[in-house]
Structure formats: structure tokens, C-alpha cells
Amino acid sequence: MSDRIYLTRDGYNRLKEELHLLMTETRKEVLEKIAEARSHGDLSENAEYDAAREEQSQLEAKIGEIENKLASATILDPKQIKTDRVYILTSVKLRNLDAEDEIIEYTLVSSEEADSDLGKISVRSPVGRSLIGKSVGDKVTISVPKGELHYEILDIFVK
């Protein structure tokens, strides 16, 4: 079994829904493609059949990956999360020390739930790794591909 992954209840349920969809509808569609390609005769020179089999292989790998994630998932209850330091599932309010009027907010989540458009960043990202374990008032320097970012932690809370 792989490393533990930490998910919210919503994140866990989304993975279960995706798995169900892949195992029912998507798998059925792929099997229909294989059957259709098989009906065209000689399989040794049947590109359509080869493509359908490759799609099946990728689908089964994706199903296995999601099953492994679900099997190794720990569901975190936001009510149990402490806010004395930055942990997974905490939200942080940061002041950009290079542009004092810029305040940003992130919620630290697992890689599986990261969505930068929603302000959810992975604890494994450069920003997430730099923030984990820090407290209100701490100043952090975050190395990113474009250089360094400098922030002060203004608040830690759970949404």
C-alpha cells in the first residue's frame, strides 16, 4: 500500500464518484469500442482494435490508481484541525512583504484536492512546504521558479 493521503470528506466522495463512473460508464464504452473493432476482422493489422486496447489499459491503470488512493486515504475532519500552526486543511492569510497591500489566502490540501483557482494548494507544493508548521507572525521565504516570494502569516483558520 502506498503512503497515506489526507482528504476531506468531499474530496474522498469525489474520488469515489469518479471511480464509479470509470468502472461503469467509461469501462462499458471502452469494451464496446473493443467489440466494434474486433468485428472488423483481422486483429493483427487493426489499428482501431489496438487503440481501443490501449485505451482499456489506460482506463484500468486509472481505476487502480484511484482504488489505491481510496484504500490509503485518511479522511480529516475540519473540526479536529488545530489552528496554532499551519497544517493540512488549514487556511492561511498572508501579507506579501514585497507588496504590502497584497493580502492572499490559501487553503492547504492534499495533492489530490489542489485547485489553484479555488485557492487550494497542495501541501507538497513549494508554497505548501514553506508554510507547513509555521505560526501567525512568522515570515516565510518561498522559492518558486520565478524567484523568491516573501510573506508574513497574518492568520491561520479552518473554513
UniProtKB/Swiss-Prot annotation:
According to UniProt, the name of this protein is Transcription elongation factor GreA
Biological-process GO terms, alphabetical: DNA-templated transcription elongation; regulation of DNA-templated transcription elongation
Q: Which residues form a coiled coil?
A: 43-75
Could you give a GO molecular-function term held by this entry? DNA binding
* Annotated transmembrane regions: none
User: Its encoding gene is what?
Assistant: greA
Which PROSITE patterns is this protein grouped with? GREAB_1, GREAB_2
Against InterPro entries, the record matches this protein to:
GreA/GreB_C_sf, TF_GreA/GreB_CS, Tscrpt_elong_fac_GreA, Tscrpt_elong_fac_GreA/B, Tscrpt_elong_fac_GreA/B_C, Tscrpt_elong_fac_GreA/B_fam, Tscrpt_elong_fac_GreA/B_N, Tscrpt_elong_fac_GreA/B_N_sf
